[in-house]
């Protein structure tokens, strides 16, 4: 980008749970024994990052295939392998379960773990319907355990920083969100910008299942979100922008797992509109990924699972049953938004 200033020296932005005084930073070392439900690519990515968190032990893995479970355990140094999910859940040496199975069985597998008194981190999408998501969160509340929706984007330092700027009013009142990727990832930046209480007054969509498309979402007080959905494989910007009455925040590519953001606050004067092309002053911030974590390909920035696992350790150490970065109310609100978009596009309710 032309005339882009050099970023300041890299640093981490204080996570919301610590910033609010709900947790202590050192509680990342709070010991938790993790069980992994599933052995697919997302589970491999997750384990590579999670095992680097100081308090985390990957204690068990389960698959419908005994061979897959055994190979996964051998590759990742996991002590126990099971060929039945029920046996993993019944293990008394586990505190928390990561559900990395396909979306269509998230509800069944999550409820299985919750009913056994285990904390759960369920991979996104949490469920395939709003009713299922509500039932899952209600079960966690009933059991007094954590069910964390795995929208990992919210735990990246760049996103933590962006949200703090929005909440403190640095860019004024948010009036526009623009994002391109899929319905879930673009939807979560909408709920972050406008809040879990903001309900759309109108949604217009275009495109069909399996192809490109988009959505224009209108909220009260003339506020909007413009989302573009791109079919894979494709090259696309994947930049998320949040515009307010005083300025704009850009979560740089890849917007769903960013390591940088740019903040533009224009002068409080009409001079920039009068015959000039002077760009708004910019502040650029970079938050490099943990360099000690070695990840398999092909997905970008999967080291960022680390941030979500850290937050879970801190929050459970403090006795919390949800992470403030992405709590129950917002999890359900996001499901409502995504399902509404997908229903209007005539898609299968299962979230790809």
Residue ranges, per PLM feature:
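Short, Asp-centered acidic motifs that coordinate Mg2+ and/or phosphate
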Residues: 60, 80, 95-96, 176, ...
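Beta-loop-alpha module in the N-terminal Rossmann-like domain of NAD(P)-dependent dehydrogenases
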Residues: 67, 76-139
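Hydrophobic residues in well-ordered beta-strands that form the structural core
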Residues: 82, 122, 147-149, 178, ...
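NAD(P)-dinucleotide binding in Rossmann-like oxidoreductases
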Residues: 223-310, 320-329
